[in-house]
Amino acid sequence: MADLFWQTSDEGSRDLVLLHGWGLNAEVWRSIEMRCAPHFRLHLVDLPGYGRSQKYGPMNLADMADEVWRYAPENALWLGWSLGGLVASRIALDHQDKVAGLITVASSPHFSAESDWPGIKPEVLHDFEHQLSKDFQRTVERFLALQTLGTDSARQDARLLKSVVLAQPMPSVEVLHVGLEILRTEDLRQPLAELAIPFLRIYGYLDGLVPRKIINILDEKWPRSVSAMMRHAAHAPFISHPDEFVGLLTEFASREVLQGR
């Protein structure tokens, strides 16, 4: 049986599970680890097939969520960034009675654009899938660069993301292909409308991958959820603005979760 990389901190009283995005690994959270420590017991996870969880082959969203859940503490807060937001959302939907709350960061319930839905053009995701087979390294670097565009610290943040990728084993091309396929095809818009646990959605105003237009749409479709906009951030707000980001987490945990819905 494959082993999932799962690292738990010794500090904090409330469990917070952190799920990274496509192509990356749990090292991406080091920028907020010390800031979160007084408030949360952190669980840093490399998703199946990523980073130190190399022994897994490609997995669809449901199987990935099931595998991560096998290692999980009950009554934790779940935070997912980008692709990790879909995994965390699937877990919250499947285990509402054992999840304290859901936080999605720069994520979308459906990443592909449609005529009435803002998102990434499907042909762009197709192009990334095609380019992966031709130039693996450059395609991953290109995707990482898109995540920081527009911020004052874009170059610095892009270098940090690249260092995170290089710090651990790279996912296989097959795992990355399936990850892009999940981004292109999964649609949790309707299921998440029924989610009955505390739910915070964090966005970056400058995000080029998750258009801010979806915020008002989802505010209307998901009235039980709460949205927060970080005005100077892009797709990786916890890297560019860690203090503001952690402030949103602690406020949500104290207001929505500890005090009840």
Curated annotation (Swiss-Prot):
Its EC number is 3.1.1.85. It catalyses: 6-carboxyhexanoyl-[ACP] methyl ester + H2O = 6-carboxyhexanoyl-[ACP] + methanol + H(+). Keywords: Biotin biosynthesis, Cytoplasm, Hydrolase, Serine esterase. SUPFAM superfamilies: alpha/beta-Hydrolases (SSF53474). One of its GO terms (molecular function) is pimelyl-[acyl-carrier protein] methyl ester esterase activity. Substrate binds at W22, S82, L83, F143, L144, A145, L146, Q147, H235. It comes from the Bacteria. It is an enzyme of class 3 (hydrolase). The keyword Cell cycle does not apply. The active site is at S82 (nucleophile), D207, H235. One of its GO terms (cellular component) is cytoplasm. Monomer. NCBIfam families: bioH. Belongs to the AB hydrolase superfamily. Carboxylesterase BioH family. This is Pimeloyl-[acyl-carrier protein] methyl ester esterase. It comes from Photorhabdus laumondii subsp. laumondii (strain DSM 15139 / CIP 105565 / TT01) (Photorhabdus luminescens subsp. laumondii). The lineage of its organism: Bacteria, Pseudomonadati, Pseudomonadota, Gammaproteobacteria, Enterobacterales.
